[in-house]
């Protein structure tokens, strides 16, 4: 889709939304067509790094011990050590609370078996199983990437709605993020954007603005 048309849709969405006393999110809605979504290979399930970032802070939890846990703490990240991890395995309510409070999880690789046993049933269905890293990993690049990442999982639905930024971002920044999502869809399918029936963008409290093909 043409970048100018995407920018025009962002402008229309912005103009149709009344001012609110909070910063509204901007979403992209895509309806798909002519895909057999009973076949897993036709479903969208992936992470996309948005070039303009998210326009907001996200929460990341690190399951680690020793030096990696200390590094995560120095970065201000939520740290879950082995003792706490084992306790979470016995307290499903707390485990769900943790899962909902954090967008991404990172785990020290040698702790993954305990993670699977303690949190797998909670994180798995949410698409939040941790990214495993070695004990001597530098967390900074991964944390920076997660800070620009959104997740899409259509399951068996022929549409998805995904966050692409905040209204405080410029039209060009939002358009670049939308284009990144559309390009990911185009690369996913052999016929590319042919499988996009239509696409819209909207602010939280605003009307949907169509993106012209």
Curated annotation (Swiss-Prot):
GO biological process: regulation of translation; translation
Gene encoding the protein: rpl1
Coiled-coil portions: none
PANTHER family: 54S RIBOSOMAL PROTEIN L1, MITOCHONDRIAL, LARGE RIBOSOMAL SUBUNIT PROTEIN UL1M
Entry similarity comment: Belongs to the universal ribosomal protein uL1 family.
Its job: Binds directly to 23S rRNA. Probably involved in E site tRNA release. Protein L1 is also a translational repressor protein, it controls the translation of its operon by binding to its mRNA.
UniProtKB keywords: Repressor, Ribonucleoprotein, Ribosomal protein, RNA-binding, rRNA-binding, Translation regulation, tRNA-binding
Assembly notes: Part of the 50S ribosomal subunit.
One of the record's GO molecular function terms: tRNA binding
Any one of the GO CC terms: large ribosomal subunit
Pfam family of the protein (one): Ribosomal_L1
Protein name as catalogued: Large ribosomal subunit protein uL1
